[in-house]
A protein has these predicted regions:
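Bacterial N-terminal signal peptides
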Residues: 15-26
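Cross-family detector of peptidyl-prolyl cis-trans isomerase
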Residues: 2, 28-235
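Bacterial N-terminal signal peptides that target proteins for export
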Residues: 2-15
Length: 235
């Protein structure tokens, strides 16, 4: 699989190009989800409103506000996976802080297996046990001034949900509609990623815990503490 390398306006960000090719891109298979500005993805979970998730790493809590108002499918997918216990025990398989703080990425279900080859982490996604296929969700980004998110494509407009410090967003392959379960925390303001990756919430408490995450650390537990009633599952 060939990765698309973003073009940067400043030479000082060139190092990020190489990082992006392996950190934010996953090894997901190409998506079959159609691109659309006004889709009706009835087969995917959806969050109507907001919810709160507490993710515990090495005994310390991280509180995340998940935003279904501006990213209903992306937020719904994450909340559903949290509720299913998918993230419990998973590893942060890539953490990049040098030469500048970048991301802490986790959520590959393969990382639950301590014998899984570390070099292959970052290639996995959530396999729906009923359908026995990987659940893929569309790239979902809401531009400022728009009533609804855009789907299946990157945008040049400023999004409502930006990559500020503490943002949580979905990792994906170079195919826009290929996110599944892998996510990342922004360890700095990463505005050059805006419009290309789907932010769906922010850390509201415990950013110091996020800043201490090391590669290889595991998620003890993630649980929905507020707003579960706002999660709408496919019928």
């Amino acid at each position: 699989m060939h990765f698309q390398i973003p073009q940067f306006k400043s030479f000082k960000f060139l190092w990020l190009a190489l990082i992006l090719s392996s950190v934010l891109f996953t090894g997901c298979s190409p998506s079959q989800i159609a691109s659309s500005a006004s889709p009706n993805y009835t087969n995917l979970p959806r969050l109507v409103g907001k919810a709160t998730v507490v993710m515990t790493v090495k005994g310390s809590p991280i509180t995340i506000e998940v935003d279904g108002d501006n990213a209903p499918i992306t937020a719904g997918n994450f909340l559903d996976l949290v509720q299913k216990g998918v993230y419990n025990g998973l590893m942060f398989h890539r953490v990049v802080r040098d030469p500048q703080p970048f991301v802490a990425q986790g959520g590959d279900p393969q990382s639950k297996d301590p014998n899984f080859p570390p070099a292959r982490l970052g290639t996995g996604g959530y396999i729906d046990p009923q359908l026995n296929i990987e659940r893929l969700i569309p790239l979902e980004i809401k531009p400022r001034g728009q009533k609804e998110p855009f789907y299946g494509k990157t945008i040049s407009e400023k999004p409502v949900l930006t990559h500020k410090l503490g943002a949580i967003a979905m990792a994906r392959s170079q195919t826009p509609n290929s996110a599944s379960s892998q996510f990342y925390f922004a360890l700095a303001d990463l505005g050059f990623l805006d419009g290309a990756y789907a932010v769906f919430g922010y850390v509201t408490d415990g950013i110091e815990v996020v800043n201490q995450i090391q590669q290889g650390d595991r998620i003890d537990q993630a649980e929905v503490t507020k707003g579960l009633a706002n999660l709408k599952l496919p019928q």
